[in-house]
Amino acid sequence: MSYTTYFLAFQLCVTLCFSGSYCQAPFFKEITILKDYFNASTSDVPNGGPLFLEILKNWKEESDKKIIQSQIVSFYFKFFEIFKDNQAIQRSMDVIKQDMFQRFLNGSSGKLNDFEKLIKIPVDNLQIQRKAISELIKVMNDLSPRSNLRKRKRSQTMFQGQRASK
């Protein structure tokens, strides 16, 4: 991973903080520490454009945006995992990870455990691949918006009933 990637990733952290209803000075301080550590303020970092910011602009609806945010948060959690033994930046990463945890998962430790469990699943393991394929039908069914489909059918039935009674 290049320093450009690191810089753009931390730029997203700053952007997320500005979009929040509150921002704490320690959060900015920790990002500054990470920027210094990764030398993320050099002129070559923006080369190639933003890492996440342009993608976030394309996702407007809140429910859709949650999908892309989950992928971005997953990236950061993996990123922090790589450097977990680095004492120079450990505190900074912990502060930022905790803030992401509060904002994205509403402080639910159960959700955090599930989220971390998912991002740690290795996709190159044959047994994991077999389990994933075995569960695919149920996962696909869970992804389909059943409640909206029922509401739509009810609305169509009511609308057809109104037209028939005229």
UniProtKB/Swiss-Prot annotation:
Main location: secreted
Coiled-coil residue spans: none
Record-linked InterPro entries: 4_helix_cytokine-like_core (IPR009079), Interferon_gamma (IPR002069)
UniProt protein name: Interferon gamma
Tissue-wise expression: Released primarily from activated T lymphocytes.
Residues found modified as Pyrrolidone carboxylic acid: Q24
Organism of this sequence: Sus scrofa
Keywords: Antiviral defense, Cytokine, Glycoprotein, Growth regulation, Pyrrolidone carboxylic acid, Secreted, Signal
N-terminal signal peptide: 1-23
